[in-house]
């Protein structure tokens, strides 16, 4: 019997108590109330599910409508363990002082809002300028589940590292920002390119076409080819069809033992069975930059999805840097801090630049 429960957990509402009652005086913005699920894809395209936290309607006996609500004490405890990276920015700056910061950023839900149509997940010009500003002072990488070319088309910054397909397609900057070379540790002239899953391209392409055919009957579904992995989006699918979609995808993948299935935010991910993930990409990039084995590096990884947890765990195991989860609801995470949405990510990046330019004075004022 298919276990759908695990596939719904990331979209379920996990906090149902007023945050003000649990804050104890700390500065943490209130969580948004759950939004109603939109079943028509055209209607959904005009709305943004900012947190992926809408109520989850279910196929009876399969996908649960809500996760168990947390108590005020549980919410308070979660916030103690994962405070706002903005409210506690001075602590972040103190931990990074005297060390070389390296910035890793997820794309969807981190630099851009989560939208119904993944092809319209545009980042704002203000966010692009914030990322460009960070890249002038710190080595900066985009680590995304997207195809590397697609995420580059969204970001449009040549001075960054890009790790697409959940880190399975990596390439270095094609241009340098004014101060970027000063921070680069890779050998001059060396092109950083790495594709650990290249042998899987034929089978991934085959499965892509099979899934396109199988999903054709499910209105609102979208199969995205991310080169070294595939994504089946169901954000625009009627909730009554979620179980059907899940079953069809699983039936296809069962015939391909070299592939595995995982869950993102209203998306099913198909990836090669290979010991490589976003955490592996983070380690590879740090090594490429010459930081392997050094204790004066401070990696900062910001992401919103469960696939980013691999990177958060790597940082915890290293005992260096911090992971920041972008979320509006409490959830299990290895990240140390939180930000609520892309606008807060933008503000955090701007603050990083300020302390680089102004030192401790950058902590004062907006």
Curated annotation (Swiss-Prot):
Keyword hit for Nucleus: no
GO biological process: trehalose biosynthetic process
InterPro entries xref list: HAD-like_sf, HAD-SF_hydro_IIB, HAD_sf, OTSB-like, Trehalose_PPase
A Pfam entry, by short name: Trehalose_PPase
Signal peptide coordinates: none
Family: Belongs to the trehalose phosphatase family.
Annotated function: Removes the phosphate from trehalose 6-phosphate to produce free trehalose. Trehalose accumulation in plant may improve abiotic stress tolerance.
Protein name as catalogued: Probable trehalose-phosphate phosphatase 3
Species lineage: Eukaryota, Viridiplantae, Streptophyta, Embryophyta, Tracheophyta
Record gene name: TPP3
């Amino acid at each position: 019997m298919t276990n759908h429960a695990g596939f719904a957990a990331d979209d379920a509402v996990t906090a149902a108590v007023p945050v003000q009652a649990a804050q104890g005086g700390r500065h943490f913005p209130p969580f948004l109330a759950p939004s109603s699920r939109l079943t028509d894809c055209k209607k959904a395209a005009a709305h943004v599910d900012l947190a992926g936290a809408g109520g989850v309607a279910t196929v009876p006996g399969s996908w649960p409508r809500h996760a168990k609500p947390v108590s005020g004490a549980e919410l308070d405890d979660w916030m103690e363990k994962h405070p706002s990276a903005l409210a506690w920015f001075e602590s972040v700056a103190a931990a990074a002082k005297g060390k070389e910061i390296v910035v890793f950023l997820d794309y969807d839900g981190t630099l851009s809002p989560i939208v119904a149509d993944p092809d319209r997940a545009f980042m704002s010009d203000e966010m692009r300028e914030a990322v460009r500003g960070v890249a002038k002072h710190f080595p900066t990488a985009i680590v995304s589940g997207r195809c590397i070319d697609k995420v580059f088309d969204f970001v449009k910054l040549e001075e960054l590292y890009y790790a697409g397909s959940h880190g399975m397609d990596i390439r270095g900057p094609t241009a340098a920002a004014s101060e970027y070379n000063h921070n680069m540790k890779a050998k001059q002239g060396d092109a950083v390119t790495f594709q650990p899953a290249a042998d899987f391209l034929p089978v991934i392409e085959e499965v892509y076409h099979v899934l396109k055919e199988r999903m054709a009957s499910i209105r609102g579904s979208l199969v995205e080819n991310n080169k070294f992995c595939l994504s089946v989006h169901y954000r625009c699918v009627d909730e009554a069809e979620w179980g059907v979609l899940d079953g069809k995808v699983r039936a296809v993948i069962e015939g391909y033992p070299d592939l595995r299935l995982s869950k993102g935010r209203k998306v099913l991910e198909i990836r090669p069975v290979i010991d490589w993930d976003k955490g592996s990409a983070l380690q590879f990039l740090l090594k490429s930059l010459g930081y392997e084995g050094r204790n004066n590096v401070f990696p900062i990884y910001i992401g919103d999805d469960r696939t980013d947890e691999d990177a958060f765990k790597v940082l915890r195991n290293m005992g260096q840097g911090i992971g920041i989860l972008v979320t509006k609801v409490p959830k299990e995470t290895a990240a140390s801090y939180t930000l609520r949405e892309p606008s807060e990510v933008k503000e955090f990046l701007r603050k990083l630049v300020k302390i680089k330019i102004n030192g401790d004075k950058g902590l004062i004022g907006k």
